[in-house]
Amino acid sequence: MRLMKEVRGRNQTEVTEFLLLGLSDNPDLQGVLFALFLLIYMANMVGNLGMIVLIKIDLCLHTPMYFFLSSLSFVDASYSSSVTPKMLVNLMAENKAISFHGCAAQFYFFGSFLGTECFLLAMMAYDRYAAIWNPLLYPVLVSGRICFLLIATSFLAGCGNAAIHTGMTFRLSFCGSNRINHFYCDTPPLLKLSCSDTHFNGIVIMAFSSFIVISCVMIVLISYLCIFIAVLKMPSLEGRHKAFSTCASYLMAVTIFFGTILFMYLRPTSSYSMEQDKVVSVFYTVIIPVLNPLIYSLKNKDVKKALKKILWKHIL
């Protein structure tokens, strides 16, 4: 009986919803931030979903490279959509609450797509390595079946990693404050709110995040080191310039993405600054998904040619 009373008392004090404090509590900034992030989100959807449609309808783009790009666009649109709409609503609404299960769902889907993007970027580096290092063997090294398996593995790994993090985070007790000092449900602010011992969670998160990010970064670095060596051996100066141009834009995007992830999740817990982290979070949840279609695709001659053809046929 005593145990039942303790459990009942604990359940009465446990948190059933959270309050997302958002980016700023200054009411004068709410409207400006809403308009700005709405425009960015719309550009994100147009760019990424447009890229998916373009690759789908143009037969010339039905190759492994563009299958990867299409998957990346889907992931960018998805992980931004798991955060941005709720952020936009909270910028204009007085009630900034999110239910316990809603917070868990947002946490899971955001983590799934973010993890999937890490793996996809590594797979795309391997794809570029195979295409430049040995073009004759490229159809064998990255066949349609292998491409599908690489992408499916990326999604499964991302979802599995997010499931572990979500299960470990939301099994904790939240019986004190329910005010999340962030604009979405993220790991550091949630762990700070928990009244359970979060030491083990911190170790597991650090271990999994370190393994995923470092292994993906190593694949990218090794792939591009091999690409760099292969490009230097090219007899054509024009071919070298084209290859270096493609690699430079890709490496810039990878550096921005993994740099922000490393900064956010692979630091000691004691060094977290919520205000600083919110700014960095805006960068990789809102800005990077908009930049990726430009960096990866719109600088590509095949994509621009396909886009002109579609516009000429259906609009002009």
UniProtKB/Swiss-Prot annotation:
Main location: membrane
Residue runs in coiled coils: none
Paired cysteines (S-S): 103-195
Subcellular location: Cell membrane
Entries under CDD domains matching the protein: 7tmA_OR5AP2-like
Cellular component aspect of the GO annotation: plasma membrane
Residues annotated as glycosylated: 11
InterPro entries attached to this UniProt entry: GPCR_Rhodpsn, GPCR_Rhodpsn_7TM, Olfact_rcpt
Residues exposed to the Extracellular side: 1-34, 78-104, 157-210, 267-278
PROSITE patterns from the UniProt entry: G_PROTEIN_RECEP_F1_1 (PS00237), G_PROTEIN_RECEP_F1_2 (PS50262)
Classification via Gene3D superfamilies: Rhodopsin 7-helix transmembrane proteins
Main function: Odorant receptor.
Name by which UniProt lists this protein: Olfactory receptor 5AP2
Lineage of the species this protein comes from: Eukaryota, Metazoa, Chordata, Craniata, Vertebrata
Primary gene name: OR5AP2
